[in-house]
Design a protein with these regions (language model features):
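Short His-Asn-centered micro-motif
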Residues: 24-26, 46, 63, 101
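Short, catalytically relevant binding-site loops at active-site mouths
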Residues: 29-31, 50-51, 67-69
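Short, flexible loop segments at the rims of nucleotide/cofactor-binding pockets, characterized by
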Residues: 39-44, 73-77
Length: 151
């Protein structure tokens, strides 16, 4: 388990309102994009171009890949586009949870972007999956998100 993983108190978790909504980042390889399309939920993509912006005004769960070198190298784990998006207070305020992908070859830093964001925003880390994800990951994440949105 990452030492960056924190336990978010159930009293501090803000349950999302509205319909299931995902905000995600995907590089030009579109790996995360293809995964998101299989979830079949309302979604918005954080732009690759740092000059473009996305502003959220409704609750969402963030799904992001991890960029990291493994070992103790955590610097650069959260894509700079995601950092820019979350630097906007309004975008942070509507984030209700995070899901991250990564590569298990990187050991302790596998999907570390999730724990980093979870800790920074004090939102739950809902799930982590490897690389492109599997059909099982898609089914688990769908179930997690549907249950998370339930009243």
């Amino acid at each position: 388990m990452h030492n960056d993983v924190i336990k978010v108190s159930s009293e501090t978790i803000i349950k999302p309102k509205g319909i299931v909504n995902v905000v995600y980042f995907s590089s030009p390889s579109n790996n995360t994009h293809r995964f998101i399309q299989k979830l079949n939920f309302l979604n918005s993509r954080i732009p690759w171009n740092l000059d473009e912006e996305l502003e959220m005004n409704e609750d969402y769960v963030l799904i992001t890949p991890t960029y990291s070198g493994g070992g103790n190298l955590k610097e650069g784990a959260v894509p700079k586009q995601v950092i820019k998006f979350l630097n906007k207070k309004q975008n942070r305020n509507f984030c209700r949870g995070v899901i991250a992908s990564g590569n298990t070859n990187f050991g302790d830093t596998f999907a570390i972007a999730g724990p980093i964001i979870s800790k920074k925003l004090n939102v739950p880390l809902l799930y982590q999956f490897e690389l492109l994800g599997t059909q099982s990951d898609i089914e688990k994440i769908r179930e997690i998100l549907i249950n998370f949105w339930r009243k």
